[in-house]
Amino acid sequence: PIHSSAASDVYKRQIQPYGDVPILAAGGIVTGKQMAAAMAMGASGAWCGSVWLTTIESEVEPVIKEKMVAANSSQTVRSRSRTGKHSRQLVTPWTQAWEADSAPEPLPMPLQPMVAEPALQKVNKLAAGGHEGAKDLATYWVGQGVGLMNQSISASDVVQEFKEDFINAFERLNNFVS
């Protein structure tokens, strides 16, 4: 199993040794509050990935966006089923089948995508057409922050929410030292 560390432990180990070198925090940052927390621990900024996947402008299939909006953080898994390398994605019967004891070992990259992607593209096409079994199988890369991504909004609204959350968190922290 792949183990995770608390974000504060990771930031402490990864940021402190570099002194004045700007470091971006990444992983699980889907709100302005989380960005402010990372910066309070020493990061110079944040790299945000998953939060953009449920935006209106995202290329992600609507069926998968719906699954992401409904998901919680425990409904992701690091799996080699898609690329041959560990990547976090939605848990589905597809990922569970590849993780089963009786499953074949995923092929190394670049071979596993040659096996997985044609099948997953077919799954997505069927899911978009309303096929219930395909909807269950459909998966996509997404981080554990998915549990906080509860609606599909525009990218500009994501930026605005980040800004407001960040400012509120910053002001709250500032009040502790004032």
Residue ranges and their predicted role:
Residues 17-26:
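Short beta-strand/loop segments at the ligand-binding rim of alpha/beta enzyme cores
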Residues 1-7, 11:
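Single conserved hydrophobic/aromatic residue that forms the stacking wall/gate
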Residues 16-17, 32-178:
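Alpha/beta catalytic cores of nucleotide-metabolism and tRNA/nucleoside-modifying enzymes
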Residues 26-32:
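Gly/Ser-rich catalytic serine loop of serine hydrolases
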